[in-house]
């Protein structure tokens, strides 16, 4: 039976450190407001936003949950973000991805002040990450690294296959892995014979939001799987990851479950970024 890479102990360790810092900043009168902004009703974003707002309130932040309509114009979204950026009570802003079709992510992200951009969406901040000048990457990418560190997985020389090339996980995670001397392969929707790549991997990170894209027959024995995917079950009851847990678990040495894995850490990494952005 594979070792389960649980997110809760990782998140709990982070929360202990954050709690003291939050109380310190409260006494100093620093802003603790947090704007969680979603445009449309992408299922994974709805789930993530709910978890994030709840966790933020529990730790002592002052979360503001914002859901803009699917049909919102680019101008409307930008104006909302600019208003939040000018609000002195708001310490940080997180804009959930993906955005509805027709909205330009880069133009919209520029409306988030760099000092309040908790997920490195502003092109300037993102560019620093991709150039290797900053390790302050999007929170989910950092959560994967935090999990690997907690479970003492040495990335040096390992072949890591990342499934997905999004700006919030795949691309920045590849840079973070390279900084740890891993050999990284990034696969995506146009990759031919995905299994050819995953069968040679020491660590596979599925991160596309496609349930079952990774199955046990696509892994070599003893591989690790850190599942970033969040998908609503077909019956609408709960969530599942991108990896087919039932077939992967007997093959793996270690695997993160969904729910119960990276998600809990991602939430805490966002809250950590809120504190960092006030420094």
Language model feature labels by segment:
Residues 24-35, 40-58:
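N-terminal glycine-rich anion-binding loops that anchor highly charged ligand groups
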Residues 1-30:
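Positively charged, low-complexity intrinsically disordered leader regions
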Residues 34, 56-70, 184-186:
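Short beta-strand elements in bilobed, periplasmic/extracellular small-molecule ligand-binding domains
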């Amino acid at each position: 039976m594979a070792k389960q890479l649980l997110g809760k102990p990782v998140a709990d360790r982070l929360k202990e450190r954050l709690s003291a810092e939050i109380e310190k900043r409260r006494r100093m009168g620093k802003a603790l407001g947090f704007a969680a902004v979603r445009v449309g009703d992408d299922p994974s974003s709805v789930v993530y936003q709910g978890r994030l707002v709840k966790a933020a309130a529990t730790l002592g932040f002052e979360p503001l949950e914002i859901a803009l309509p699917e049909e919102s114009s680019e101008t409307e979204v930008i104006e909302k973000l600019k208003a939040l950026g000018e609000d002195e009570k708001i310490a940080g802003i997180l804009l959930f991805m993906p955005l509805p079709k027709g909205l330009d992510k880069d133009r919209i992200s520029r409306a988030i002040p760099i000092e309040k951009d908790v997920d490195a969406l502003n092109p300037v901040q993102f560019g620093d990450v991709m150039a290797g000048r900053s390790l302050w990457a999007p929170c989910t990418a950092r959560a994967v690294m935090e999990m690997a560190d907690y479970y003492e997985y040495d990335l040096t020389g390992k072949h890591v296959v990342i499934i997905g090339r999004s700006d919030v996980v795949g691309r920045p995670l590849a840079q973070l892995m390279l900084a740890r001397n891993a050999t990284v392969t990034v696969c995506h929707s146009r990759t031919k014979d995905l299994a050819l790549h995953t069968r040679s991997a020491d660590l596979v990170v599925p991160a596309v939001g496609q349930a079952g894209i990774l199955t046990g027959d696509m892994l070599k024995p003893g591989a690790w799987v850190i599942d970033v995917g969040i998908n609503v079950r077909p019956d609408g009851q709960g969530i599942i990851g991108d990896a087919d847990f039932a077939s992967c678990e007997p093959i793996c040495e270690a695997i993160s479950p969904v729910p119960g894995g990276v998600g809990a850490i991602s939430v805490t990494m966002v809250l950590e970024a809120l504190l960092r952005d006030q420094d």
